[in-house]
Amino acid sequence: MKMTVAITNHNQHAMVKETIELLLSSATKPAHIYVLSDGKPFWDFTGDPRVVPLNNTGKFTGRCGNRNSVIAPFLESGDDAIVFMDGDCFPDTPDFLENYAILLDNHDLVFGTRRHTPVTGLHMPPSDLLTANMDNLYHCEPLNYADLRLVSGAVGAWRNSRTFSERLDLMLTGMIGWSCNFGFSRNGLERLREFQKSTYGLDEGIFDSNAFQEGWGYEDVAMGIDALYAGLDITITDGVRVGHHSHDRSDGLFDHVKGRHAIMERYRGLEKASESWEWVKRAAIVASAFFTGGLITGLVTCAITMQSMMGIN
C-alpha cells in the first residue's frame, strides 16, 4: 500500500523535522510526506523527493484550510491512503505506518490515539490530560499520560457499539473524531468528499472552513460526524498511537462553547436532510409499488383474455 503522510505545521519546525526522520527510518516508508505550513515557511532539509513542503497562504490557512491543502495533491498522487498528524506529534511505535496500512486496508477511516509527554514545568497542561486525571489529581496520585478516549472508555464503547445511534452518540460527545492522528483510505476519502459536496457544497477538502473558521476546534468532530452519515466504515484504536509533545494549552474554559453549538447545528441539519431523503425513498417505493402493481394487473388481465379467446376458438 502506498501511503501519504500529511503533517500540519504552525511554526513547529524542529518537531516536524524529528517526525520526518522517524517516518523515513521506519520499516514501512511513506510514498509522500507533505508538510502543511500556515506560519513561517518550511523548507525540506532532507533532499528526499518524498518530502513536499506546502507553504500555504489565503484560503489554505487555519485549522481547516491548512489540512484541506493536501487533499488535491494526495488524490493526484495515486497513493492508496493518507495519514494526518499534528505538528507537535510523532509516531510512538516503530510499526506505526505498518499498522495503519493494515487498518486502512479494512476500514475507510481510522482514528488513532495519542500519549502525552511529561508536563513538568508547564503552567497550563493540556485540558484533555487534566480531564483524564481528575481522580489522580484529587488523590495526589501520579498522572496517567494515556489518551483521554482510552481512559474514559470511549475507545472500548466504540468497539462494542452495534447501531448507528450508538456511534452517533459517541461522535457527538467529541470523544472519537480527533484530528491529531487519523487516516483515510482513498475510497473512504472520495466517498466522504462526494457526501460533503452534495450536502454542503464543500469541494475544496474535508474540513468545513465556512462553519468552523472561528472559535476553538470541532472541525474534526464535524468531519467524523459527516463520515458517519456518509456510511463510512470507521474505527478507533490504540494500535496506531502518536506521542504528543506536551505544551501549555491555548484554549480557555469557554472556548469550546461555540464549537459545541456548531456541532449540534450540523447534527440537526444532517438529521433533517436524512429525514427528507428517507421520505423521498419511501415515496419512490410506494410509486414503484403502484406502477408494478398496475403492470402486473395489466399482464394478468391480458393473459386471462388470451386464454378466454383461445378457449372460444
Segments (PLM) and residue ranges:
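N-proximal low-complexity "stem/linker" segments adjacent to membrane-targeting elements
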Residues: 1-22
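Short, acidic, metal-binding catalytic loop of nucleotide-sugar glycosyltransferases
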Residues: 21-30
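Glycine-rich, basic loop-to-helix element that forms the pyrophosphate-binding segment
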Residues: 57-74
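Short beta-strand-to-loop acidic/aromatic patch adjacent to the donor-nucleotide binding site
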Residues: 79-90
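Acidic donor-binding/catalytic loop of UDP-sugar-dependent glycosyltransferases
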Residues: 89-102
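Short beta-strand-to-loop element that shapes/binds the nucleotide-sugar donor at the catalytic cleft/hinge
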Residues: 110-130, 135-137
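A recurrent flexible, glycine/aromatic-enriched loop bordering the glycosyltransferase active site
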Residues: 146-156, 163-184
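Acidic donor-binding loop at a coil-to-helix junction in glycosyltransferase catalytic cores
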Residues: 214-222
